[in-house]
């Protein structure tokens, strides 16, 4: 039997759970009856026993796709429009973020698994002579399906410590991220930021710095994947902040039309009040809110201005929704040439440099958090950060990386000193 070219089958693990149907340019999601009896809604906006608006389906799927230049490379490879969500998902469906596998209706889940080894020498050669195409496309196949704009590829780290590409039923376990000429030392920046987050006891993805010749890279362990045996990867379903809010990817910033004068007042994108409100849908709302609070305050302390709606994710399972580890933490102040406006306002403040007791009190009130809780967590994080930054470290830095690290330390220490002075006023200041 030849499958319908306008129907995609959705699998979670070995279970076929739903169909996506394209009718007159609209996408429709329908759960299988067996899954409705035994499963769960994979997103709050793709409910089990209600009609699902096509707009919800379109937004959910678009948030599975890469963004920016990586998306442009993929549409050229597949000869598709970037607006053809159905076609792009069909092309990338074997290795989407989380646990979903999305395939044409006439195509079964692959039973075979193949590991395509990538040697250090091969990757170094690609990086030395790279453009976006030859970094993403290997053996005529795109090796990127995760969302985001940064240069990166999906890889498998096998039991022998070798890097490669998973094919067939073998999906990626790690993401390998690279820096560009525009963002020198970005790999070191993110490594330091993730290390500091761990020092502050935030739940973050595990990362390692790698070098391929003169090219640094960040190897990020996927928290939605775990290699069980040589050919078996256990996957865990998750959604990002945009999917949680039922928003398209371009609404990942609170000021979804930008911050120019005529549109700055439009704030329909993902925001901190929306995230804290969504925490009420999680298994443990109080714990989730405290974890998000620590993420927000840590981002303030290290100048991670670009903490947007696609840089936070939630696990979704039979037992409910829970916060996933944090990722993509970067000190943006190290790059003065880039935008330093906050992705999500603290209260009404988008200026990342103008964060004082007033803004933190406004943030607490706006998100319905006790000011005393915000002050307590801020003081705790400052203590952890300053201790970590003053300790001796063994990071095997090379060239000018040591100077970069010192500058990073100075910026964060100065921020900590300033906000520690402001901290006692958070509970008493009048708005």
Question: Would you name each region that the model predicts?
Answer:
Residues 1-431:
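Phosphate/dinucleotide-binding and metal-coordinating scaffold of catalytic cores
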């Amino acid at each position: 039997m030849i499958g319908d070219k306008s129907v995609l089958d959705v699998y979670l693990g070995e279970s076929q759970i739903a169909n996506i149907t394209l009718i007159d340019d609209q996408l429709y999601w329908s759960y299988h009856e067996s899954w409705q009896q035994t499963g769960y809604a994979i997103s709050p906006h793709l409910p089990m026993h209600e009609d699902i608006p096509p707009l919800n389906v379109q937004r959910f799927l678009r948030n599975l796709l890469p963004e920016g230049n990586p998306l442009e490379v993929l549409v050229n490879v597949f000869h598709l429009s970037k607006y053809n969500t159905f076609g792009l998902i069909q092309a990338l469906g074997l290795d989407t973020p989380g646990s979903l596998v999305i395939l044409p209706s006439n195509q079964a889940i692959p039973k075979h698994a193949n590991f395509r080894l990538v040697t250090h020498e091969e990757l170094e050669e690609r990086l030395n002579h790279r453009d976006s195409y030859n970094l993403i496309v290997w053996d005529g196949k795109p090796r990127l399906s995760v969302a985001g704009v940064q240069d990166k590829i999906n890889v498998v780290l096998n039991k022998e410590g070798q890097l490669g590409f998973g094919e067939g039923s073998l999906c990626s376990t790690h993401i390998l991220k690279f820096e560009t000429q525009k963002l020198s030392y970005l790999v070191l920046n993110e490594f330091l930021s993730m290390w500091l987050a761990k020092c502050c006891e935030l739940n973050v993805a595990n990362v390692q710095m790698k070098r391929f010749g003169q090219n640094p890279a960040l190897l990020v362990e996927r928290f939605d994947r775990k290699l069980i045996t040589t050919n078996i990867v256990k996957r865990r379903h998750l959604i990002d902040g945009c999917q949680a809010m039922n928003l398209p990817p371009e609404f990942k910033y609170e000021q979804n039309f930008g911050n120019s004068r005529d549109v700055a007042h439009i704030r329909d994108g993902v925001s901190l009040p929306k995230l804290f409100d969504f925490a009420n849908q999680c298994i443990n709302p109080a714990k989730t809110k405290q974890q998000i609070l620590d993420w927000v305050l840590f981002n303030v302390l290290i100048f991670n201005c670009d903490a947007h709606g696609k840089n936070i994710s939630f696990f979704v399972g039979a037992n409910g929704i829970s916060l996933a580890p944090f990722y993509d933490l970067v000190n943006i102040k190290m790059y003065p040439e880039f935008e330093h406006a906050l992705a999500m306002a603290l209260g009404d403040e988008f200026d990342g440099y103008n964060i004082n007791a007033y803004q933190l009190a406004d943030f607490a009130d706006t998100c319905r958090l006790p000011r005393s809780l915000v002050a307590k967590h801020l003081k705790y994080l400052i203590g952890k950060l300053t201790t970590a930054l003053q300790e001796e470290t063994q990071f095997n830095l090379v060239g000018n990386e040591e100077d970069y690290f010192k500058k990073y330390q100075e910026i964060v220490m100065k921020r900590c000193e300033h906000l520690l002075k402001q901290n006692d006023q958070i509970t008493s200041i009048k708005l």
